[in-house]
Amino acid sequence: MLYASGRLLAARAATTLSAPPRARGPALRGKRRELQIPWHLETPSYDPLTGQRTRPGVPPARRVILRKGRMPPAIGGGLAGSELRPRRGRCVPQAARAVSRDVVPQAAARKLKRPAWSSRRFQAAGWWATLAVVTLLSFATRFHRLDQPAHICWDETHFGKMGSYYINRTFFFDVHPPLGKMLIGLAGYLSGYDGTFLFQKPGDRYEHHSYMGMRGFCAFLGSWLIPFAYLTVLDLSKSFPAALLTAALLTFDTGCLTLSQYILLDPILMFFIMAAMLSMVKYNSCANRPFSAPWWFWLSLTGISLAGALGVKFVGLFIIVQVGLNTISDLWHLFGDLSLSLVTVGKHLTARILCLIVLPLVLYVTIFAVHVMVLNKSGPGDGFFSSAFQARLSGNSLHNASIPEHLAYGSVITVKNLRMAIGYLHSHRHLYPEGIGARQQQVTTYLHKDYNNLWIIKKYNANTDPLDPSFPVEFVRHGDIIRLEHKETTRNLHSHYHEAPLTRKHYQVTGYGINGTGDSNDFWRIEVVNRKFGNRIKVLRSRIRLIHLVTGCVLGSSGKILPKWGWEQLEVTCTPYLKETTNSIWNIEEHINPKLPNISLDVLQPSFPEILLESHMVMIRGNNGLKPKDNEFTSKPWHWPINYQGLRFSGANDTDFRVYLLGNPVVWWLNLVSIVLYLLSGSTIAVAMQRGIQLPAELQGLTKVLLRGGGQLLLGWMLHYFPFFLMGRILYFHHYFPAMLFSSMLTGILWDTLLRLCAWGLAPSPLGRRIHAVGILSLLLTTAYSFYLFHPLAYGMVGPLAQEPESPMAGLRWLESWDF
């Protein structure tokens, strides 16, 4: 490296002191289109061993278009210093052009000989052949032993069950958008799965049920990650070794392999993320031919992939941000190109709005439309949604139902919180434990329909039965003082000055009394928030609040999950803060009163925009509410890049078939080192260029690849990693894998570039001509051998645990935190 640095300084001195002055001449007339492509490098030619830039042969009849008022550089400057415009009709990979004789006569005589094996046609054939081998190897590793183990592994219990729900058209709730589960259900349906397997818990055997279609679909999409990464790096770096090294890192990573072999959302998500990244890079590379068929194809495919990524998980927002930043940079450069009219810039802006905003948005909304249309039967997710939403679900108690319109004394009702994913006012015979306020009956909110959700509304000062036929019907009105008696336990809704179980400065809410007899702390004043229906309380439509008469607090739910003594239901409190919030607003859902006439609820069904909005509100609240349970394993974001601890997919004992999600440590630690090296080398080069240091022409192409292509990948890694530090929800190891894809691609580009720089610096010596090939080959062999050592983690293992000395995996437990 010292020798390389010496050569660099010598070349710089030669360029600075002895370069002949530039010839001057008249500027060429005519309109010029100067195309600057953000994050993209024009195609250079390099010596495959030394990394030195070479010049292709010069066709005699080709003219060059120069910047206004500038002439070609001196002969010694090389192509890196010329201001050439690619001929219209060619994409950037074919855009390198030579200088014609009438502009620079000496150029034709200055041809650099290139080996026959590195000709463009042979090189392209080698790229395609390698891509075919990479693709076959990727599919072979992902489909190998796909049927093992023949039982549920980890989150297959969730996403396999949700695939069954789609086949059975049963409505359910999940914190993720529906596309991934829809595709899993479709794959199961097309492969003969009938949707009858229960997917109850990990370890349950599939028996005669067809599960290979769903696993095969996920493995199919996971297998395309490697070819996509290969093509992305090849386009960013124009380097076959960099692309091959990237493909090897991902092919031989046990973590990516494991995630791709099971019924999970991760391979589907990563497929769309990588497809979006590849499409973005491809349409950037065709930016010299705007509005052509390939340009439109890749731009549209980028938008489709963005819709797919967001339709699987909200993590897809990160790749949307990356494409958005690239688009802003692209448009900014086009806007600064004075050779382009504002009409042309407007066309570019319109094309990107159509393909990157309108098209993904239409597809995303269509995904939800199909989701709502297919899932039309009542299921376990009903309680997460509003009463009006439930009225559209076949089999729900509100579907095609007829109930009394106005609330009256003596009615049996359910009271539902207006905030999404809070549920129904609920009580049961269990008491609050010692030390948690008064030891009285628990009152909670519960997300599912249950007989313990039923309450009887009564006057505060009367114990007579309002349903007695001899008594006239009396409607409940705004401002009335009432009691709510729990139908199952006959205890009254009650509050007092004891502190709530979880929320400070809120009061405890309990069930109190015997057979409806209690005290003045059972009295509540009912207030109608939206009084456009009058003073009467309308079922489903009226929004009400319950004000405690003694303490003056308002009944609400904090949304916090109670410990096991509260059956992990949600806390109900009486808050002294009387500000109107959705947590303290309720509506009457079910209403039973034989003395009142019924009306149909069909008119209350929501429109599709209302369904779409409510679905997202419920998903967001559900995502934020994912908290770790007692003794549940979680991980922290700083654990992930260092491969600190894996995740047990299947089995725990030495007699079990064990699958352990853990990244290949050689790959992951190499990625981590590469990120650090990139930050150091990239910063050094950027500072040097900013200070005006002129690099030799042979190095300018390499530094552009490192800064532009590597910078794009570093941005992708940061966008898919750092946001997790800000999330309050429960996190798992598998959340890092989209970021890991970007770090692996960055590793391929970085090491290829560094080895080429070493080869250039050591070029006179025999080592200089071999160091690049030897370095790349060493990395490939090391990665392949590490996969040979760690492949049982992905394909399964039986026998003693790694902690046991006699275990064949004992020597591979490099960290104490690895539990396989």
UniProtKB/Swiss-Prot annotation:
Output the InterPro entries linked to this UniProt entry: GlyclTrfase_39-like (IPR027005), Glyco_trans_39/83 (IPR003342), MIR_dom_sf (IPR036300), MIR_motif (IPR016093), PMT_4TMC (IPR032421)
Return the Pfam families for the record.
MIR, PMT, PMT_4TMC
Query: What is the main EC category here?
Result: transferase
Gene3D superfamilies given in the database record:
2.80.10.50
Q: In which pathway does it act?
A: Protein modification; protein glycosylation
What modifications does the entry list under PTM / processing?
N-glycosylated.
Tissues of expression: Ubiquitous. Highly expressed in the acrosome of cap phase spermatids, in spermatocytes and liver. Isoform 1 seems to be testis-specific.
Q: What keywords would UniProt list here?
A: Endoplasmic reticulum, Glycoprotein, Glycosyltransferase, Membrane, Repeat, Transferase, Transmembrane, Transmembrane helix
Q: Where in the cell is it found?
A: Endoplasmic reticulum membrane
Q: Which domain of life is it from?
A: Eukaryota
What are its E.C. numbers? 2.4.1.109
Q: What is the recorded membrane topology of this protein? A: Multi-pass membrane protein
A Gene Ontology annotation in the biological process aspect, one of them, is:
basement membrane organization
- Any idea which GO molecular function terms this record carries? dolichyl-phosphate-mannose-protein mannosyltransferase activity; mannosyltransferase activity
Residues of the MIR domain: 404-460, 473-529, 534-591
| Cellular compartments per GO CC | cytosol; dolichyl-phosphate-mannose-protein mannosyltransferase complex; endoplasmic reticulum membrane; nucleolus; nucleoplasm
Q: Which reaction does it catalyse?
A: a di-trans,poly-cis-dolichyl beta-D-mannosyl phosphate + L-seryl-[protein] = 3-O-(alpha-D-mannosyl)-L-seryl-[protein] + a di-trans,poly-cis-dolichyl phosphate + H(+); a di-trans,poly-cis-dolichyl beta-D-mannosyl phosphate + L-threonyl-[protein] = 3-O-(alpha-D-mannosyl)-L-threonyl-[protein] + a di-trans,poly-cis-dolichyl phosphate + H(+)
| Chain's role | Transfers mannosyl residues to the hydroxyl group of serine or threonine residues. Coexpression of both POMT1 and POMT2 is necessary for enzyme activity, expression of either POMT1 or POMT2 alone is insufficient. Essentially dedicated to O-mannosylation of alpha-DAG1 and few other proteins but not of cadherins and protocaherins.
Q: Which family does the UniProt entry place this protein in?
A: Belongs to the glycosyltransferase 39 family.
Q: What is this protein called?
A: Protein O-mannosyl-transferase 2
Gene source species: Mus musculus (Mouse)
Q: Which gene encodes it?
A: Pomt2
